[in-house]
A protein has these predicted regions:
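ASCE RecA-like P-loop NTPase motor cores
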Residues: 23-25, 130, 138
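Charge-rich, low-complexity amphipathic helices
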Residues: 69-70, 119-120, 128
Length: 139
């Protein structure tokens, strides 16, 4: 095989690998409470109604009744329970997300710092791993 053929094949393989990565949609708001999480949940319902395998990976409702109500009817991946400094805390279960392989996963609180000892220090790093697994993320 000539070098030219190899380069062409390698470029094509790189393109295939790139296309297998998940797509990332992010909601940005000017301040807390403007409706980012609410809008993500509305979108999740629309996707589900259209036959898309969408799951909730992590949502923080901040005890807002309207936001909590929007979780009704959406499949939720259970959070991973971890103990840290004597307290039980809930975290995104990145491995469960990757194992379940939904078409789309909703992940809130992108800037969150993970509990020490995890693979990634920040939730946004978890999202990158999920995208590399070919799962689309809305955050």
């Amino acid at each position: 095989m000539s070098d030219n053929n190899y380069n062409t094949a390698q470029e094509f393989l790189d393109l295939i690998k790139k296309s297998r990565k998940g797509k990332f949609k992010i909601y940005i708001g000017m301040s807390v409470g403007v409706g980012k999480t609410y809008r993500m949940l509305q979108e999740a319902h629309t996707l589900l109604r259209n036959g898309i395998d969408v799951k909730i990976g992590y949502i923080e409702t901040h005890n807002r009744e309207e936001t909590q109500a929007l979780l009704e009817g959406l499949p939720v991946i259970p959070r991973r329970k971890l103990f840290y400094k004597g307290k039980e805390l809930d975290e995104l279960d990145m491995q469960a997300v990757i194992s379940l392989r939904p078409e789309v996963v909703i992940i809130d609180e992108l800037a969150h710092t993970n509990i020490g000892g995890r693979k990634n220090n920040k939730r946004w790093q978890d999202v990158i791993d999920i995208l590399h697994a070919g799962i689309n993320v809305i955050s």
